[in-house]
Curated annotation (Swiss-Prot):
NCBIfam families: PRK10792.1, PRK14186.1. This is Bifunctional protein FolD. It comes from Aquifex aeolicus (strain VF5). One of its GO terms (biological process) is purine nucleotide biosynthetic process. Keywords: Amino-acid biosynthesis, Histidine biosynthesis, Hydrolase, Methionine biosynthesis, Multifunctional enzyme, NADP, One-carbon metabolism, Oxidoreductase, Purine biosynthesis. The gene is folD. NADP(+) binds at G166, A167, G168, I191, I232. The keyword NADP applies. Homodimer.
Length: 291
């Protein structure tokens, strides 16, 4: 039976530490960290994700500023709001919930967010820092959450064969860069990969981020592999991941559940990035208040 990589319990522990750190700053007269969250439209899944992020902020003492714009909002109006938030010294992070409606240029929106407030880590400046392995950038939240989860359970990716199924902008691509930074040997499978099973069978660590329910079967992994499931879907009324959990857990050495694995770690990584931005802004003042 595989070790369950419990992202929910680890997230709870990290969030308690974040809360204490925020309380330490506010007790010295500093304002709390602030995250601005922008939601365009009424996509049910996006609304759930945004609510989860806002609740997580409030529980650790991070101020959540919520901007809910209509589905038909103009791109210029959205960019105008982002400009105002960029200029607001009391905002530490800006998050625009993706995906956006088709009439809005997602790339233009991402580029409009100040890199210093891009706590999602999608701005080319932060992606470039990930490529260059520069510590002071923001790492995208799901890859960062996975990295923290693996480290917590003592799973070292150095020298290991890591296969990532899914080459998306939000998870697959930045995760491949982060795994390279951690000195793994990385393979990335995508829609044009001819034989996905060939790569997954060789993986010491298999990470799937496709959103295709139960894509990863028991016969696609090798004995003793570590399996990380990023996907979240509904199948027959139940929430499931990319991995056929019940069967794969009998063959894997460690596995993340869905829900309760990567999801909570993604939100926790967002909180960590927001705190990082806040501390950077007040670094010179914080150091002078410490004995």
């Amino acid at each position: 039976m595989a070790l369950i990589l419990d992202g929910k319990s680890l997230s709870k522990k990290i969030r308690e530490e974040i809360k204490k750190e925020v309380e330490n700053f506010t007790s010295k007269g500093f304002r709390p960290p602030a995250l601005a969250v922008i939601l365009v439209g009424n996509d049910p899944a996006s609304e759930i994700y945004v609510n989860n992020k806002r609740k997580a902020c409030e529980k650790v003492g991070i101020k959540s500023l919520f901007y809910h714009l209509p589905q038909d909002v103009s791109e210029e109006k959205l960019l105008g709001l982002i400009y105002e938030l960029n200029m607001n010294e009391e905002v530490d992070g800006i998050l625009v919930q993706l995906p956006l409606p088709k009439h809005i240029d997602q790339t233009r929106v991402i580029l409009s967010i100040s890199p210093e407030k891009d706590v999602d880590g999608f701005h080319p400046e932060n992606m470039g820092k990930l490529v260059a392995q520069i510590e002071d950038g923001f790492i995208p939240c799901t890859p960062l959450g996975i990295d923290i989860l693996l480290k917590h359970y003592g799973i070292d990716v150095k020298g290991k064969d890591v296969t990532i199924v899914g080459a998306g902008f939000i998870v697959g691509r930045p995760l491949s860069l982060l795994m390279l930074w951690r000195n793994a040997t990385v393979s990335v499978c995508h829609i044009h990969t001819k034989d996905v099973k060939k790569f997954t069978k060789e993986a010491d660590i298999l990470i799937s981020a496709t959103g295709v329910p139960h894509l990863i079967k028991e016969d696609m992994i090798k004995e003793g592999a570590v399996v990380v499931d990023v996907g979240i879907s509904r199948l027959n009324g139940k929430i499931v991941g990319d991995v056929d959990f019940e069967r794969v857990k009998e063959k894997a050495s460690a596995i993340t559940p869905v829900p309760g694995g990567v999801g909570p770690m993604t939100v926790t990584a967002l909180l960590l990035n927001t705190l990082k931005s806040y501390k950077r802004k007040f670094a010179h003042l914080i150091s002078t208040t410490n004995p």
